[in-house]
Amino acid sequence: MNVVFAVKQYISKMIEDSGPGMKVLLMDKETTGIVSMVYTQSEILQKEVYLFERIDSQNREIMKHLKAICFLRPTKENVEYLIQELRRPKYSIYFIYFSNVISKSDVKSLAEADEQEVVAEVQEFYGDYIAVNPHLFSLNILGCCQGRNWDPAQLSRTTQGLTALLLSLKKCPMIRYQLSSEAAKRLGECVKQVISKEYELFEFRRTEVPPLLLILDRCDDAITPLLNQWTYQAMVHELLGINNNRIDLSRVPGISKDLREVVLSAENDEFYANNMYLNFAEIGSNIKNLMEDFQKKRPKEQQKLESIADMKAFVENYPQFKKMSGTVSKHVTVVGELSRLVSERNLLEVSEVEQELACQNDHSSALQNVKRLLQNPKVTEFDAVRLVMLYALHYERHSSNSLPGLIVDLRSKGVAEKYRKLVSAVVEYGGKRVRGSDLFSPKDAVAITKQFLKGLKGVENVYTQHQPFLHETLDHLIKGRLKENLYPYLGPSTLRDRPQDIIVFIIGGATYEEALTVYNLNRTTPGVRIVLGGTTIHNTKSFLEEVLASGLHSRSRESSQATSRSANRR
């Protein structure tokens, strides 16, 4: 179950099926992103694709010597653009691939528009999602719900993305969902409807143990997306932001022109592939090794190219050297900027207190540490409010809850009202009343013993103590212990055996910390394959945008009186 490989295969097949000759790849905004995640432009150029165009671009030239490969989402707009294109074709022949199921009526409309008979084929290739890592996919949807319910357009897009994912991996799963989330049940029903309607597409070879789709809701764990991160990929997303593998470095002080935007892709960058799940300290020493290796391989200025053999060796090595030079400068810049931000924002200290809020249960120590950091001028308003949110979520119903006082401290620190208001919005979004699970206190004896032993041994790294709630959920699922009264099956049948192929989807967005959890479970659990997906991949900033978009904040009030009243009521 490798989503990058699945999408890559589709694109390779499109290009191969169009035969030899020069080609143009005609895409829409979304499929452009889907393709760019798995192929670089130079890789596609090697396959005789010399031009990349958008179907909605008005000023494309007529180029009858090119074949057109169209890879488009089956939307009304795209079908209309194609109809216009086929009435006045700009290319010699058209190979049309839709990223999802296309209606018969749309195919009929296209056939009627194709008066010049330029269409060679129309097919469905189910690459209708963003393949981020081999075990991680996203739909790039921010703000999928209105209150607790789906935005209808986003429900439709998510259903399409999830069913395409299942088709691309050739899985017809049983479905379980988080009972506490109406949105999870609704999505499960929509996926099930598509499977029933398009049953012929889902007729795959039966496996002994059917695959399982588990649908979860971000509301059940609002802690994970609020934490600072210390592994490479997650940290880059948290501090710099990753958008379809691209990182905007234009705000970095003294940045050179060619490094204003860089691409981090494990497919084309060996250093990144080997380091994306390692912690920041290891990255530092690995980058030093990369630099030293680069110094050794670097062509020396005084190097004499005396013989033809010398020159040949230099020319052969130069592309590799050039690539290595680009890799070195890119990672040195990224790691340098992460380092600068950690120091400037005092993130080591901030993160230690975040971890205490997420993992420990000592209220007075936590409160003292949060108050101390709120007084620290190096701590930004963003980090200050994140600490107060973590406190508010953890100690929401604590008898000595001091949230009103912390809100006053935020105001004294000069934190903007828009941030202060978000504290109650986050509690409204993912507080105790909403959660189907208990995030903070292990209930069973085994979990309590584990936590006690963990406390005795001490934690190897205070900055990475936290494990997402997803870890516990998947651990129980793999061992056949996930409670059916909390995660029921959709429909009458249940799974007798432990699942082997698991697709987990998080409504409201997944995180790179959860992707790391899935990566580690895949690595350490023989016979189990897990793929994680989400409506988007969050960092703290985008998660707070998700909370705002849900509209729940409009019901919550910032005043400390309201906060304390609700604390008493609960």
Swiss-Prot record:
The keyword Transcription does not apply. It is a peripheral membrane protein. It holds the Pfam family Sec1. One of its GO terms (cellular component) is Golgi membrane. Transmembrane segments: none annotated. The keyword Cytoplasm does not apply. Keywords: Endosome, Golgi apparatus, Membrane, Phosphoprotein, Protein transport, Transport. GO terms for biological process: protein transport; vesicle-mediated transport. Belongs to the STXBP/unc-18/SEC1 family. This is Vacuolar protein sorting-associated protein 45. It comes from Mus musculus (Mouse).
